[in-house]
Amino acid sequence: MYSKEVQKLLDKLKTEVGDRIQIIKDKKTFEGILMPRIEMGDLNSIVLKLDNGYNIGIKFEKGVKINKIKKEWSVTKKKIEPSKKLIFDKKLPNISIIGTGGTIASKIDYRSGGVYASFSPDDIVMQIPELKEIANMQTNEIMNIMSEDMTPEKWIDIAKAVAKEINSGIKGVLITHGTDTLHYTSAALSFMLRDLPVPVALVGAQRSSDRGSSDTVMNIACAANFVANSNVAEICTVMHGTMNDDYCLAVRGTKSRKMHTSRRDAFRPINELPIAKIFWKDRHIEITNDDYRRRNDKKVLVDDKIESKVALVKIYPGIDPEIFDYYLKKKYRGFVIEGTGLGHVSTFGEKSLLSSIEKIIELDIPVVMTSQCIYGRVHPFVYHPLRVLSSKGVIYAEDMLSETAYVKLMWVLGHAKKLDEIKKMMLTNYAGEITNRVISNSFLI
């Protein structure tokens, strides 16, 4: 909504969003489509979409004149329905697509310029007829949200949906998901789904599915090929491997991270090589890391006991030690500290965190240390302050990603309460989250 003054004039002119209007200001005339006000925009700035496609804002003030020209379009959105049903070859493997939302399930409203959730898994499949040559597939939309709205409780819903599909005899599962928190979900599923017998691929898109530059088609085609035909029984992310449309990377779910806000090849393996390259055109799957779980005949188990009151705290110069008091008052049960370098926090400075950390551990609340460097591993013995923190009970999480450690601590706290048990579980490699040795050619790939 615009300001009361602007809205009063629009109502008087019987003008609404979608109408073509003319605005005269300072002897200049502007003509275009009246747009909704940007949510965080100025209440008195009228937004026009010009005929060239650009939006402009015009400040409404004394002397500004508005004329209605005609009604141009309605803002009412109708649900997109699949136009036809794809027919698959019964000789091909059966896979399942589970929809959770995100950009991959969104389209642009070019009139307003916004992206909104629109496509169901069925809609996406309809855009990719080549899928009928890869596998038979069934679709199930369990939610349609942008990934910033994902919660630990929704991870459990996804895990249960995946397990149900797998235990029905499906050969692989593809999960469509928003990219921003996709690696949190991939880590969560890696811990919650035990004895995984088939591949599970989380796939997203950096560009909405109706755009010419969308990465949806290639990402889904590669992910479908991966879960249908590979011998990998792991939770993986499957996204563009380069800026070009040549191949996707299958990256272990606990070692994958979004490393760019908008590039199509944003998801990279951290501290290890990707498990596979999946080539789009010829559908060749090249294994690039032989350390993976193979397909098997086990029944997947859902282990969804978690404690969601875990905080992920980033260390920065001047951080106030009292920030931890807030979390303690909120009864948080665990902390992952993203320290500097090898796992440092201010230990002997004027804003030392040492006493705050000691207080937390004395309450039998675990403190886990990761590095904001992303690559490499933390180490409790290289410098004296690190030794001090370690002696107080801080758990140094090897080369775990901060996001993975955050999710893992939730899962561990669902199974252990004593600090020694928690430490043992945090340092046990359950889903490839810890590598014994970080190889040099795993950096920036």
Language model regions located:
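Conserved RNA-binding domains used in RNP assembly and mRNA/RNA metabolism
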Residues: M1-F88
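Accessory alpha-helical/coil subdomains and C-terminal extensions
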Residues: I98-G99, D109, S118-P121, M126-L131, ...
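Catalytic-core regions built around general acid/base machinery
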Residues: K164, D195, K351-V367
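Short acidic, glycine-rich surface-loop motifs adjacent to enzyme active sites
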Residues: N167-L182, K330-H344
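Short Gly/Thr/Asp-enriched flexible loops that form oxyanion-binding sites at enzyme active sites
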Residues: I175-V198, T347-S356
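Internal gly/pro-rich beta-alpha loop/helix module
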Residues: V203-W280
